[in-house]
Amino acid sequence: MERFEIFSLYDQIDDDIEYQWLIDGLIPLQHPTIIYGEKGSYKTLLGLHIALCLSSGMNVCGLESKSSKVLLLALEGSNDVMPRAKAHMENYGYPTESSFYYTSPPFAFGNPALEAILRHEIEDKGINVMIVDTLSQARPKGSFNDDGLASIITRSLAKYSEEWGITTLSIGHTGKDSSKGLVGSKVFQNDVPCILKVKSKKVIVEKQRSGRTGAIFPFTVHEQEINERGQTAIWLEWDDQKMKPRQRMIIQALETLSNEYTDGVPKKELKKEVWQIDPKADPNKTDSFRTQFNRDINELAKHGEIQIVSDGLIKRNKRNNAAD
């Protein structure tokens, strides 16, 4: 006979207790999160931005984030994925190795055959985070207003967290009346632990059981030329982290190296990492690169983004980016 796994509180109460986060205080680790908004609110771009940051070991919006292997289910099509990823990397730097995967398969929550295929791919590639874009493209037959259908989806999301050991971020829409929030049954609002609303280029923490409920994170969307034909794609920047491209790459390099150098990253190693990820690094212009690097280091320190500690070591300043 199968049995429930039951824990004794007093066997563990003296342990070091802490919440586990994918993105500190914002997105819980191994729990479902829904990101929703109206058409044109950049919610899909936000999902891709989060995926690219997590997969390259970058923090999101200045909040400490867990480096992850990410799978994007681009169920509305993948035509925008590579152009937008290119625009992102032109401004945040190119990762030295890829931990970001995407696919556009047929998929429906609660379908055992499709879920078995998906789970095999997740385990094969060691995926930690799955982004579903969008909920409406992955729903079983029926209406989101049907509590039974909504329960199938929320139970599936919970299963992916509890049994598969992954964190899910699902992209959703508002209904015809956007003031009523996330489209469909109240089951979504009640049963999903974290809900983020995207409106007017702001991420609003609408529901968060243990973190930053009510916090607001404004962002700006830019266009970036991605090829010699002048074609462009959009990328996202958090408003309180506006920096020059090389400065963003310095921050990315610091975050990549911080686990190896816990007391601070040696300036020489930091410069070497930035050189590797900078798409515009020119071997014939090492002197100008070094000059601009030093200038950017001083500017970042002046604005409190980094700290130059003893012996030429550099650390990232931790900041609370939640706005009132």
Segments predicted by a language model, with ranges:
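C-terminal regions of RecA-like/P-loop NTPase motor modules
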Residues: 6, 123-126, 163, 201-324
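Conserved RecA-like P-loop NTPase ATPase core
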Residues: 27, 72, 133, 169, ...
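Non-catalytic, mobile gating and regulatory segments of ester bond hydrolases
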Residues: 10-23, 28-29
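Pre-Walker A (Motif I) flank of P-loop NTPase domains
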Residues: 29-33, 68
